[in-house]
């Protein structure tokens, strides 16, 4: 199995949809009911996020993926599966995957995509945007150091997906 990650707006959902159209099983961790949730970092209690929450709330919470549920989901696929997403605790489950791909693009592009997307409200509010902009460089360089394969999503979607498929088959 393979994992595709990257900050909000780099094209993870679009890549997942196109992989599905090409007959490659894929799912977005944000789209699977109860797989991911916000938790309070101190109390570990589940929390509800909505657009427009302040910086204080975001400092105290993180988006996490349930590793056991993820393993169970991956094991339901007989052939390869491509999982896409980004969670605060993804370091805990990256070792489940044969390869990890890091989608990246310039900030102007991912901000424009966030503003224009209709499938996810995260990042539309100023505070969320600022957090993504403060966070993405460190996030990306850390993943590359961990061996993620960088894929530039400034290119047309079809070329991005072709590159990923080539890397999966090698």
Report the location of each language-model feature.
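Conserved phosphate-donor/acceptor-positioning beta-strand/loop module used by diverse small-molecule
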Residues: 96-117
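Walker A/P-loop
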Residues: 13
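Hydrophobic anchor at the beta1->P-loop junction of P-loop NTPases
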Residues: 4
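P-loop (Walker A) phosphate-binding loop of NTP-binding proteins
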Residues: 7
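Glycine-rich phosphate-binding loop used to anchor ATP phosphates in small-molecule kinases
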Residues: 55-97, 103-104
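ATP-binding Walker
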Residues: 10
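Conserved substrate/cofactor phosphate-moiety recognition/catalytic segment
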Residues: 17-67
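Small-molecule kinase domains that catalyze NTP-dependent phosphoryl transfer to phosphate-bearing small molecules
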Residues: 90, 116-163
């Amino acid at each position: 199995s393979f994992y595709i990650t990257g900050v909000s707006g780099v094209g993870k959902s679009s890549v997942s949809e196109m992989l599905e159209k090409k007959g490659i099983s894929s799912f977005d961790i944000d789209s699977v009911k109860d797989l991911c949730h916000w938790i309070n970092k101190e109390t570990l209690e589940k929390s509800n996020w909505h657009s427009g929450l302040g910086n204080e709330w975001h400092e105290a919470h993180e988006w996490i993926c349930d590793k056991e549920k993820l393993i169970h989901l991956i094991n339901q696929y007989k052939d390869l599966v491509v999982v896409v997403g980004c969670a605060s605790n993804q370091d805990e489950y990256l070792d489940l995957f044969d390869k990890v791909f890091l989608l990246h693009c310039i900030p102007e592009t991912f901000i424009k995509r966030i503003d224009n997307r209709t499938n996810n409200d995260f990042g539309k509010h100023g505070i969320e945007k600022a957090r993504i902009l403060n966070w993405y460089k460190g996030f990306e360089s850390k993943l590359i150091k961990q061996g993620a394969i960088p894929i530039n999503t400034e290119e047309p979607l079809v070329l991005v997906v072709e590159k990923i498929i080539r890397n999966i088959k090698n």
